[in-house]
Amino acid sequence: MGEQIRTDYDLLVDDPSLSCTPASVSRIWANPNSRIKITEQSDAIEISYEFFDLRRRIPVGDDSVMSDSPSTKNLSGTLFAEMGSSFAFYEGSTLIIESRNHAPGYIRTSRGIPQSPNTVAIEELEVRDGELHITHTYRDESLFEVPLVLEYSFRRIEAEDVDIYSCTDADYDWFLDLNNKSDGK
């Protein structure tokens, strides 16, 4: 099933970013040069992403603290089920975030790798040698024969806050124009 969804995917039409919608948590972590701020509250982890002005509030505890509502919204208050409903807990010094209840969509928009309401995503965040390392594992037996594992590393910068992104709807006309020029049209 996952391979058929991937085959049918058309980046120039199906990419949710064109309407300022985050495709998935993985897509947000992977966006280059966008600031991310992580803060720990007494009962939750809060992650602010510059990309799409997203704010993610993740309760700390077991799955009983996870809401049925999405954990992520933008500054306008729009909730994004593509990012799932999450809860967090610690194993030693590693922060683990588990997300479920995803809207159907794409883990990776460049390749059309899908996610479904059955997808369970585990993010393991650990600081090593002054860098934040994230191992992000997606499991969904209806889509994948083996789990999809992605890894990211981030360096801390001096900035305290994330910038405002102010997303506006977009299109891939620039990409089509570029390809037409290279085709001699």
Mark where each language-model region is.
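PEST-like low-complexity, intrinsically disordered acidic/proline/serine-rich tracts
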Residues: 1-185
